[in-house]
Curated annotation (Swiss-Prot):
Pfam families: Hist_deacetyl. The record marks Y323 as: Polarizes the scissile carbonyl of the substrate. It comes from Pseudomonas aeruginosa (strain ATCC 15692 / DSM 22644 / CIP 104116 / JCM 14847 / LMG 12228 / 1C / PRS 101 / PAO1). PANTHER family: HISTONE DEACETYLASE 8, HISTONE DEACETYLASE HDAC1-RELATED. Homodimer. The gene is aphB. This is Acetylpolyamine amidohydrolase 2.
């Protein structure tokens, strides 16, 4: 399987995030992607290739012009205030507040985010545009006839919506790739999000559309981040009704429980008859992940890949979460190897 990867991810390395009421060193760090790449090479998964540059237009097909412009200029605007530490928001436009973009950089930072878990640094812009290009390069390979590609994206993307960032995510790589499939002639695209945390951004982007099916298996939002989307009764809106399927599971869920939700999602994908499948590949479902509470073990990821491979769809794997750094490479590549063992 071809892997698309860029060293530019290392340019984004936030020092702290706000979690559990404390500023904590970021769990989302460069060593995550480095460990996955090392495993890709160690098992001989296939060629590793740098991404092409697709410019900003494919990103603007998903993200608002104001949001893209904010991210492009954020660091320079921050420096202009005399500050050079990482950017984190302090206020958000919640219920009954005006939804008007402020002029002040701190106000804009809150306006375009939903939490304090996506620090912007000097290298963030280059890293996030490269991450989007990693996804777009994988999509392009599939559009040109490849049957499967691994886009080793970092930073991840599935918490980012059209006009907000959060949860380590800035541009929604999976959504950008899905839109690119449609723009190149696909009629229907399915997204399967297997990250422990609900892909709220991806759901938000496609919630009122029928040309993208979104399925997600994740921790119950009554108790788990991101809390405010991911319930089973969220089925889509308008013409998108019936094209959104959430499978929230209790803390402690193991493979026996998790795999039942996977089979339910697979049935929806089969019925949808998609032209392509995008897997938002988070492996923070692992039993030793420091910020998640499922109980999957490393061999379970082989079985996960096999189940996805049996769909027989042209498939793009887009890297999302996974914070047990020593095992992230083993678990992510197990999915890919399990997939390759059965995919035709």
């Amino acid at each position: 399987m071809l892997t698309i990867y860029s060293d530019d991810h290392r340019l984004h390395h936030g020092r702290h995030e706000l979690i559990g009421g404390q500023f904590t060193p970021c769990f989302e760090k460069p060593s995550r992607a480095d460990m996955v790449l090392d495993r890709v090479k160690a098992v001989g998964l296939g060629e590793v290739r740098a991404p092409r540059d697709f410019g900003l237009e494919p990103i603007r097909r998903v993200h608002s012009e104001g949001f893209v412009r904010f991210l492009q200029n954020a660091w320079q605007d921050w420096l202009a205030t005399g500050r050079s530490h990482d950017m984190l928001p302090i206020a958000w436009p919640t219920r009954r507040l005006r939804q008007t973009e402020p002029d002040n950089i701190d106000g804009r930072l809150g306006y375009y985010s939903f939490d304090a878990g996506a620090p912007i640094t000097a290298g963030t812009w280059q890293a996030i545009t490269s991450s989007a290009n990693v996804a777009l390069s994988g999509q392009s390979e599939l559009a040109n006839g490849a049957r499967s590609v691994f886009s080793l994206c970092r930073p991840p993307g599935h918490h980012a919506a059209a006009d907000y960032m959060g949860g380590y995510c800035f541009f929604n790589n999976a959504a950008i790739a899905a839109q690119a499939f449609l723009d190149r002639g696909a009629g229907r695209v399915a997204i399967l999000d297997v990250d422990y945390h609900h892909g709220n951004g991806t759901q938000d982007i496609f919630y009122d559309r029928a040309d993208v099916l979104f399925t997600s298996i994740h921790g119950d939002p009554r108790f788990e981040y991101p809390y405010f989307l991911g319930y089973a009764d969220e089925k889509g809106n308008g013409v998108g009704t019936g094209y959104n399927f959430n499978y929230p599971l209790a803390a402690g869920s193991d493979w026996a429980t998790w795999s039942q939700a996977l089979q339910a999602a697979i049935r929806q994908i089969q019925a949808y008859a998609a032209d392509a499948l995008i897997v938002s590949l988070g492996v923070d479902t692992f039993k030793e992940d420091p910020i998640s509470q499922f109980r999957l073990d490393s061999p379970d990821y082989l079985r996960m890949g096999e189940a996805i491979g049996k769909l027989g769809l042209a498939t793009l794997f887009v890297m999302e979460g996974g914070y047990a750094v020593e095992e992230i490479g083993i678990n992510a590549v197990n999915v890919l190897q399990g997939f390759e063992g059965v995919h035709r």
